[in-house]
Amino acid sequence: MTDVKKNENMTFEEAMKGLESIVSKLEEGDVPLEQAINYFQEGMALSKMCHEKLQKVEKQMDFILKEDGELAPFSVQEEDEGDK
């Protein structure tokens, strides 16, 4: 099991792989209760880490360069259901 506190500098992708591994182990259903709780706690920490990294990237993407070189808020346009 990975020590999340020691891996605060792990990448988003590494954290997601850790989450996938934990989910896989828990889905097997052959995990003692105490170990399942530890996996759950680690998964929650990894999930929080991923969420924080995504929020940071979202803030970075909130500003993009306009044609005149000024920073402007970035807005995502939702796809219409008919466009799919």
UniProtKB/Swiss-Prot annotation:
GO terms for cellular component: cytosol; exodeoxyribonuclease VII complex. GO terms for molecular function: exodeoxyribonuclease VII activity. InterPro entries: Exonuc_VII_S, Exonuc_VII_ssu_sf. GO terms for biological process: DNA catabolic process. It is found in: Cytoplasm. It is an enzyme of class 3 (hydrolase). It catalyses: Exonucleolytic cleavage in either 5'- to 3'- or 3'- to 5'-direction to yield nucleoside 5'-phosphates. Its main location: cytoplasm. The keyword Transcription regulation does not apply. Signal peptide: none annotated. Keywords: Cytoplasm, Exonuclease, Hydrolase, Nuclease. Its EC number is 3.1.11.6. HAMAP family: Exonuc_7_S. Heterooligomer composed of large and small subunits. Belongs to the XseB family. Bidirectionally degrades single-stranded DNA into large acid-insoluble oligonucleotides, which are then degraded further into small acid-soluble oligonucleotides. This is Exodeoxyribonuclease 7 small subunit. It comes from Bacillus subtilis (strain 168). The lineage of its organism: Bacteria, Bacillati, Bacillota, Bacilli, Bacillales. The gene is xseB.
